[in-house]
Structures are given as C-alpha cells and as structure tokens.
From Swiss-Prot:
Pathway membership, UniProt: Purine metabolism; 7-cyano-7-deazaguanine biosynthesis
Cofactor: Zn(2+)
Function, in words: Catalyzes the ATP-dependent conversion of 7-carboxy-7-deazaguanine (CDG) to 7-cyano-7-deazaguanine (preQ(0)).
PANTHER family according to UniProt: 7-CYANO-7-DEAZAGUANINE SYNTHASE
Protein residues bound to Zn(2+): 188, 197, 200, 203
Catalytic activity: 7-carboxy-7-deazaguanine + NH4(+) + ATP = 7-cyano-7-deazaguanine + ADP + phosphate + H2O + H(+)
Name of the protein this chain belongs to: 7-cyano-7-deazaguanine synthase
HAMAP family in alphabetical order: QueC
Lineage: Bacteria, Pseudomonadati, Pseudomonadota, Gammaproteobacteria, Enterobacterales
Amino acid sequence: MKRAVVVFSGGQDSTTCLVQALQQYDEVHCVTFDYGQRHRAEIDVARELALKLGARAHKVLDVTLLNELAVSSLTRDSIPVPDYEPEADGIPNTFVPGRNILFLTLAAIYAYQVKAEAVITGVCETDFSGYPDCRDEFVKALNHAVSLGMAKDIRFETPLMWIDKAETWALADYYGKLDLVRNETLTCYNGIKGDGCGHCAACNLRSNGLHHYLADKPTVMAAMKQKTGLK
C-alpha cells in the first residue's frame, strides 16, 4: 500500500497537493501545525477540508514553541502584515524562520510512524514570496539529512516547485476541484477565507494567478501538463 503525509495548511497550495495525493496514493494522512499564527483560522479550514476530501487521518500538532522563538508578522499581532509591494527586496517580515525546517522534520517523523513513503509539501520556487525555505535546494538538503537521521528513505515531494500560481490553479482544475480551492481554502495572511483580504502578498499571488489562468485556460493547462508530466 502506498502511503503519503501531506503538510496541510488548508491554503490553495497544500489543498491542491492533497487533491493530487489522493489520486496517487492509497492512503493519505494530513498534518497541520498550530504555531500561534495570526491566520490560525486556517487550522479549522484544514480540518474541514481534510474530512471533506477524504484523508485517512488528520493530525494537528501544537508547535507554539515556534511562536516564542520566531519573530514575524505572522507570529506577532503587533507587527502589521505589509501590503503587497511588487518591487520589494529582501526577505519579507511574513517569513517565519525555521518554519519549514520544523514542519518537514515533524511530518517525516509522522510518516515514519504510519509507514508512509513520502512527505508532500506545497512549497514553490517559481513565484515564491522570497522565503529561503521554499527553495528546491533547501528541501533536497533537509530530505537528505532526515533520511540519514532516520535510516529510512522518506521522500520529500514538491509537486508545485516548478509551476507558477496560474498553473497551480490549472492543476486544481485538472482534478475537478477549482471551485473548491477557490472558495473553501484560506491562503490570506490576515486569515480571510476564499479571495482573502486582497492586499497581502499571498492574496496578490493567488489572485493574479487565478486571473491569468481564467484568461487563457488552454495555454496554461498545456504548460502545467508539460511541466508535471500529466496527460
């Protein structure tokens, strides 16, 4: 039996990953992390979606220790989430240092326990928000370290790594879940479901990608299939 663990926030990217994983694996487990995030409404959204989509199990882990250590606008109400700035340089204040290091490591421990062969995460390098822990180089390095440390070949899969946000919408549509992802996920840094606040970087990436996809579905769908190998 093929099993996988999906790092699941209830946002566009991880929900699309879950939808695909349910088609590719016999048994899919979800793991969501409560780190005292500003947009913690995502936890309830993740619970609802994991149940609705048919995950075998859904575990919510308390990692509020991260909130104490990592200062970010996503972990401190006193630090405002900035509006999207297309020319912004450097790492944004929404970056939570160590978040994906912790999440992927804990997800791998969970995968070890449930005998899953893969940990799936929705990180993306193509149009990422400037986060160093979304890079392919980082994921591969951590995967190698975790496999060595556990003496077990647990594979980190990043199905969205080389597709852009428009193509991520196309992937959801490919599996017949475009409307679900559009209306029932929570991507917004300010914790607003669906189309979100419309001002933060997460909402901007999501909205621009959707508009691009809807404006030229055939071309974007073809590009997504070429990059992912889907027929």
